[in-house]
Design a protein with these regions (language model features):
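Hydrophobic/aromatic residues within transmembrane alpha-helices
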Residues: 2, 15, 66-68, 125, ...
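C-terminal long alpha-helix characteristic of the crotonase
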Residues: 75-80, 126-179
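A short acidic, glycine-rich active-site loop
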Residues: 21-35
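CoA-thioester-processing core
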Residues: 40, 44, 54, 60-113, ...
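Glycine-rich phosphate-binding loop at the start of an alpha helix
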Residues: 13, 31-38, 61-62, 119, ...
Length: 198
């Protein structure tokens, strides 16, 4: 289970000020950060046990992407939104991230998400099928833990569970083939990058 201690945010994504700032930075080497983050997402999407995101508040940009990398999502019923707002802030969505959205979201939700930066409420995300359960604010994490406990038996054979994940999500029925999101996330540098705005 991935959860946040912040009552308002699950994850607000990347620190854009840090990513776009010039010169050396105490936060580390920004040149490798994008590819390393994508590899982390690739690891989670194929993790050999069931994974649940306890989305207790807003999940924007890479925070939305992180939530989608989990097998299931429990989201707060009354507040919080999921949104890929890159187009609004002038940041292109890399092909690997587009592949993840394409494979994890229903077709109508994919286009609304990436082209129009739709802000999905919990109710809308649940109705669209990419959130599996809604909960009140003080129950999001406990409901996610309950769901994880229910699904934990499926991770008893980790090798099989991982293999199954790798063969579900790709458009060619194998997540790690060259058009599958896990392969693209892991090898993000091999794909064309969209133009930078500004």
């Amino acid at each position: 289970v991935t959860a946040s201690s912040d009552p308002k945010f699950f994850s607000n994504g990347l620190d854009l000020d840090w990513i776009t700032s010039k010169g050396d930075h105490e936060g580390g080497d920004r040149r490798v950060f994008g590819d390393e983050a994508m590899k982390l997402f690739a690891r989670l999407i194929t993790f050999p046990i069931p994974t649940i995101a306890a989305v207790n508040g807003h999940a924007f940009g890479a925070g939305f992407m992180w939530a989608l990398c989990h097998d299931q999502r429990v989201m707060r019923r009354d507040r919080g939104m999921m949104c890929a707002n890159e187009i609004e802030i002038g940041v292109p969505i890399p092909e690997a991230e587009l592949a993840l959205f394409h494979h994890k979201l229903p077709r109508h939700a994919f286009y609304e998400t990436v082209q129009f930066a739709k802000r999905w409420t919990g109710e809308e995300a649940f109705s669209s099928g990419f959130v599996q359960e809604l909960a009140d604010q003080d129950e999001v994490t406990s409901k996610a833990i309950e769901r994880a406990e229910e699904l934990s038996r499926l991770g008893a054979n980790r090798e099989l569970f991982k293999w199954q994940k790798e063969h579900i999500w790709g458009s060619d029925a194998a997540i790690n083939r060259t058009d599958g999101p896990a392969h693209m996330l892991h090898n993000n540098g091999d794909y064309p990058h969209p133009p930078r705005s500004g």
